[in-house]
A protein has these predicted regions:
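Residues that flank catalytic or metal-binding motifs in active/ligand-binding sites
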Residues: 91, 119-120, 146
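Amphipathic alpha-helical interaction surfaces
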Residues: 69, 98-101, 126-130
């Protein structure tokens, strides 16, 4: 029976989609709906550490999917912030580590919308390596001032994706959300 089923199988041809405001909205709604469902499921689990871990992994997947499609690959954006003067070899980086974002969401410190739109940066690979060497790869000294994770390790200047220079010592998470509010995909 299995052999016959395999012999009859015809591989589907999936259509390609062009990025439009509608495709970004589709991805946004899909990720939001699934993250909301997973957060609710996480809160209902009692005494099953492996299931909790699997749910955290699933939340991470949808957060990263949104960040990849709706921010990194978004026309004219590539990240919320860019390191000024970085060469072509850059990494897409979360100013607040992705696991911390997920944990903030699970503890209700931030909303799903805020988790989807946390600050991201195009950071030179050399500076990213310095960050890792300093032990800041998956932690941060200050979530309110998200750039302090960098300023404690190296000097650099940053601008928004549309060219506004920001002060990494004083730019707050609240300023980030206010500045980028118009880019939220609803």
């Amino acid at each position: 029976m299995l052999k016959e089923s395999l012999d009859k199988f015809i591989a589907p041809v999936y259509g390609k989609t062009k990025r439009t405001p509608n495709t970004y909205q589709t991805v946004s709604h899909h990720c939001t709906r699934n993250i909301t469902r997973l957060v609710d499921e996480y809160r209902s689990v009692k005494n099953d550490q492996q299931l909790l871990r699997e749910i955290r992994n699933d939340i991470d997947y949808y957060l990263r999917r949104y960040h990849e499609y709706c921010i990194k690959q978004r026309d004219g954006m590539s990240a919320h912030y860019h390191e000024i003067g970085a060469d072509a070899k850059t990494d897409f980086e979360h100013l607040i580590p992705a696991a911390r974002i997920r944990d903030l969401l699970l503890s209700e410190a931030i909303t799903v919308e805020q988790a989807l739109n946390v600050p991201t940066v195009k950071l030179s690979r050399a500076k990213h390596a310095l960050l890792k060497e300093a032990g800041w790869a998956s932690t941060t000294p200050d979530m309110w001032y998200p750039f302090r994770r960098y300023t404690q390790v190296f000097g650099a200047s940053f601008e928004t994706h549309d060219g506004k220079t920001i002060d990494p010592e004083t730019w707050t998470l609240e300023e980030h959300y206010a500045y980028f509010e118009h880019l939220i995909i609803g």
